[in-house]
Swiss-Prot record:
Keywords: Cytoplasm, Glycolysis, Lyase, Magnesium, Metal-binding, Secreted. The active site is at residues 205, 339. SMART domains: Enolase_C, Enolase_N. This is Enolase. Its EC number is 4.2.1.11. It is found in: Cytoplasm; Secreted; Cell surface. It comes from Anaeromyxobacter dehalogenans (strain 2CP-1 / ATCC BAA-258). Mg(2+) binds at residues 242, 287, 314.
Length: 429
């Protein structure tokens, strides 16, 4: 019934105007699944390889014709005839066909497109929404949105070093109310920034990207916006940071340099800097607080703040079970960011989530800075019982599409659904 009968692919554009891969998989029932692959701006060194053409005369070298050709000429002949409902076998076939540790032969973007499209085709063939097909009957938890309303670092052209400042509406009763809260704070922040004469253009993920004096000023204006929107900081709304510390780490010197503030820290100093921010503001989560290979400072940070805050490994773990296992063994961080394109297949993504949950780590489903209208991660957040999702601000349709899908899922679940709220954060339980 769900035998794969056709696989095709094309080059489309993502939210930054860069090419990406879109795949369609057709199964014997006549159902078709379609998936578009996202792309990151600040990417971890240990991520699976996103295959680009490298032809500078076309899309500045960022074309994906090679990956598209690999889907059509290499992957399709190998998977036609397989059962799309057997996700593990399908993904294993593609991984074996590639034969490299980072999927560099066929491209993680090629493999992932087929992996996700096949899952969507199978779900439709079985008459199930994707979250129910992947997550089973127990998939009913709506995630807390970590809404990136102010951008810095690699996501914006400004002197704010920390990459993302997020509002976390954890004290609301439903996902719909949490989303409304985040949107109202987003609009209030625009007024606050305008009042200070700051720019209100938005970055890659829909958050404002003003040039502010310091990271702390960014936190201060968000706190002001929360109050102006009529919400209570700490009780109804908390804050989260994605520091993307690998972007401001000097590997040769072993120092972290916040150029916008003129500050330079060793690992111990950086941990103290975060501790001071957490003491002053209602921060519940810090992502990528240290460099992706600075395990020693990660250990210091976990020992200092791991009992109070969620410490999320993104570039550190890259949704990879080998790196995650090392983190668990060393007692580093207490949470993992989940990005399907970091590892390049649905099966491996689900394995990482299961490993994290077994170890008592929280999981945060995440978008990338280069997105499309594809809403797969909204369903996966519910399917995987992540409890949290990062999918940008309350602007840009590529971000809003995911939030709207979660609104639909909440409506469909009705009384059986629950909003994760504060319970999504282990330190707050």
């Amino acid at each position: 019934m769900t035998e794969i009968i056709n696989v095709t692919a094309r080059e489309i554009l993502d939210s930054r105007g860069n090419p990406t891969v879109e795949v369609e998989v057709a199964v014997g029932t006549g159902d078709v699944g379609r998936a578009a692959v996202p792309s990151g701006a600040s990417t971890g060194e240990h991520e699976a390889l996103e295959l680009r053409d490298g032809d500078k005369g076309r899309y500045l070298g960022k074309g994906v014709r090679k990956a598209v050709a690999n889907v059509i000429d290499e992957i399709a002949p190998a998977v036609v005839g397989l059962d799309a409902s057997d996700q593990a076998s399908l993904d294993a076939r593609m991984i074996a066909l590639d034969g490299t540790p980072t999927k560099s032969k066929l491209g993680a973007n090629a493999i992932l497109g087929v992996s996700l499209a096949a899952a969507k085709a199978a779900a439709t063939a079985h008459g199930l929404p994707l979250y129910r097909y992947v997550g089973g009957a127990g998939a009913r938890t709506l995630p807390v949105p970590l809404m990136n309303i102010l951008n810095g670092g690699a996501h914006a052209d400004s002197n704010v070093d920390i990459q993302e400042f997020m509002v976390v509406p954890l004290g609301l009763p439903t996902f719909a109310e949490a989303l409304r809260c985040g949107a109202e704070i987003f609009h209030a922040l625009k007024k606050v920034l305008k009042g200070k004469g700051a720019a209100t253009g938005v970055g890659d993920e829909g958050g404002y990207a003003p040039s502010l004096a310091s990271n702390e000023e960014a936190l201060a204006v968000i706190m002001e916006a929360i109050g102006q929107a009529g919400y209570e900081p700490g009780k109804q709304v908390a804050l989260a940071l994605d520091c993307a510390a690998s972007e401001f780490y000097d590997k040769k010197a072993g120092k972290y340099e916040l150029e916008g503030e003129g500050k330079r820290f060793d690992g111990k100093g950086l941990v103290e800097y975060y501790a001071q921010l957490a003491a002053k503001y209602p921060i519940v989560s810090i992502e990528d607080g240290c460099d992706e290979d600075d395990w020693a400072t990660w250990k210091l940070l976990t020992e200092r703040l791991g009992g109070k805050l969620q410490l999320v490994g993104d570039d550190l773990f890259v949704t990879n079970v080998t790196r995650l296992a090392r983190g668990i063994e060393q007692g580093v961080t207490n949470s993992i960011l989940v990005k399907v394109n970091q590892i390049g297949s649905l099966t491996e993504t689900l394995e990482a989530v299961r490993m994290a949950h077994r170890a008592g780590y929280t999981t945060v489903m995440s978008h990338r800075s280069g997105e499309t209208e594809d809403t797969t991660i909204a369903d996966l957040a519910v399917a995987c019982d992540c409890g949290q999702i990062k999918t940008g601000s309350a602007s840009r349709t590529d971000r809003i599409a995911k939030y709207n899908q979660l609104l639909r899922i909440e409506e469909e679940l009705g009384g059986s659904g629950r909003y994760a709220g504060r319970s999504a954060f282990k330190a707050l339980r």
